[in-house]
Amino acid sequence: MSWQTYVDEHLMCDMDGHVLTSAAILGHDGSVWAQSAGFPELKPAEITAILNDFNEPGSLAPTGMYINGAKYMVIQGEPGVVIRGKKGSGGVTIKKSNMALIFGLYDEPMTPGQCNLVVERLGDYLIEQGY
């Protein structure tokens, strides 16, 4: 299965009638493995800050997290495993696997819980597969 198939069929899937706004799978070096249409381009400093928060949980909380210059308030995730952010009526969930970062961005009517479920389910699967 290609990385694009994981994005198209497992991240951009219908969740109770709602779909993520955009999604992507990136390597820890920031390289894009696959992404949906409309996924924002991440700047190198933004990827570095996200990876730093996985290594030092809480480091993003004081300043917020930035995705393509848009600021997200960091909300409780799972230290070292999941980062969650909120911006207006939407937000982001980022799951870290051994080799990848799985991003899901959403807006209402999708809920944070639905986004978390979609992103974390794929992340857990990739971890089980050694990725």
From Swiss-Prot:
Name the Gene3D superfamilies for this protein: Dynein light chain 2a, cytoplasmic
Q: Which UniProt keywords apply?
A: Actin-binding, Allergen, Cytoplasm, Cytoskeleton, Disulfide bond
- Top-level lineage group: Eukaryota
Instruction: Cite the InterPro entries for this sequence.
Output: PFN, PFN_euk, PFN_sf, Profilin_CS
The UniProt entry, under PROSITE patterns, shows:
PROFILIN (PS00414)
Pfam families, per the entry: Profilin
GO biological process terms, alphabetically, are: protein homotetramerization
Instruction: State the tissue distribution.
Output: Expressed in pollen (at protein level). Expressed in pollen.
Subcellular localization is given as: Cytoplasm, Cytoskeleton
Any one Gene Ontology cellular component term annotated for this protein: cell cortex
Name the cystine pairs: C13-C115
Which CDD domains does the record match to this protein? PROF
Q: How does it assemble?
A: Exists as monomer and tetramer. Occurs in many kinds of cells as a complex with monomeric actin in a 1:1 ratio.
The Swiss-Prot or TrEMBL record describes its family as follows: Belongs to the profilin family.
Main function: Binds to actin and affects the structure of the cytoskeleton. At high concentrations, profilin prevents the polymerization of actin, whereas it enhances it at low concentrations. By binding to PIP2, it inhibits the formation of IP3 and DG.
Specify the protein name.
Profilin
| Species whose genome carries this gene | Crocus sativus
